């Protein structure tokens, strides 16, 4: 008899179908990200998926596992997708290959494959790249309305593989907006500018021209929010983690903002910038590395939300979703141990 590994679900849908549903739910966010930041994200995702399938197939072959059966569970594709859309669109090709190899081979297969990994593989790959190559990992283009140079599919492909567009511009030149000023993400801009300006002056910059948050980034987050609500509606994920994540992050941001509005970002900026919605619905809800009890999921999600706020405000990185998820993964055994539902009729006794 062969027993399948986790993740297990309460319904009869296979792991393959659930993974595919999560991939499809990412589409609204990917469309928004492609519109505002170019085709580079699609190229990164394709490179990551090819690398993930080849790497997982090779490791499964070495482990004498059924290659095609394991590859068809779509878990490698989902890991690749999450990593691909997390990287700057025009990051060098070798970075996505390296990050994907680390995610699949080290963070997933080294622990025994799907259902055995204690950490989210995509976030392990992301953090390895962020620590090793911080400059490349923060080289985001300005959103479409602020771009000084339009970057099409061909130029995106050339920049990823050669470092230059067909006209000879590199990534640093492409980062310069229409106003001649090098652009950064809203969270990065806010955090850096706070050293010399009050918040109300910072928010006058064009990058903060969105209704909810940063220009472009608010639509990316809304896209992933739509996909996340689809997953909740289809019962592919539990509500506990994303709700507690967003409430904790929004609560911390609201309290600090009300106390010192000139020193802290507003709750809306935190909720609709960076990887907030992607993290809440697609990353933190990983059924393998997240808590498995109802109360545990609430604690797990809230812990991630608090850690994201702490890292964004006091840490060395503008966005803290990846670090927060991995730190929370460490606490899962402890959380699950103390939040196990009590068996009906069970009474604690003494020897």
UniProtKB/Swiss-Prot annotation:
It is a multi-pass membrane protein. The keyword Translocase applies. Its main location: membrane. The modification FMN phosphoryl threonine is found at residue 185. GO terms for biological process: electron transport chain; transmembrane transport. It comes from the Bacteria. Its cofactor is FMN. The chain crosses the membrane at residues 18-38, 40-60, 87-107, 121-141, 211-231, 241-261, 264-284, 298-318, 320-340. The keyword Cell membrane applies. It is found in: Cell inner membrane. One of its GO terms (cellular component) is plasma membrane. Its EC number is 7.-.-.-. Pfam families: NQR2_RnfD_RnfE. Disulfide bonds: none annotated. InterPro entries: NqrB/RnfD, RnfD_bac. Keywords: Cell inner membrane, Cell membrane, Electron transport, Flavoprotein, FMN, Membrane, Phosphoprotein, Translocase, Transmembrane, Transmembrane helix, Transport. The complex is composed of six subunits: RnfA, RnfB, RnfC, RnfD, RnfE and RnfG. Part of a membrane-bound complex that couples electron transfer with translocation of ions across the membrane. Belongs to the NqrB/RnfD family. This is Ion-translocating oxidoreductase complex subunit D. It comes from Yersinia pseudotuberculosis serotype O:1b (strain IP 31758). The gene is rnfD.
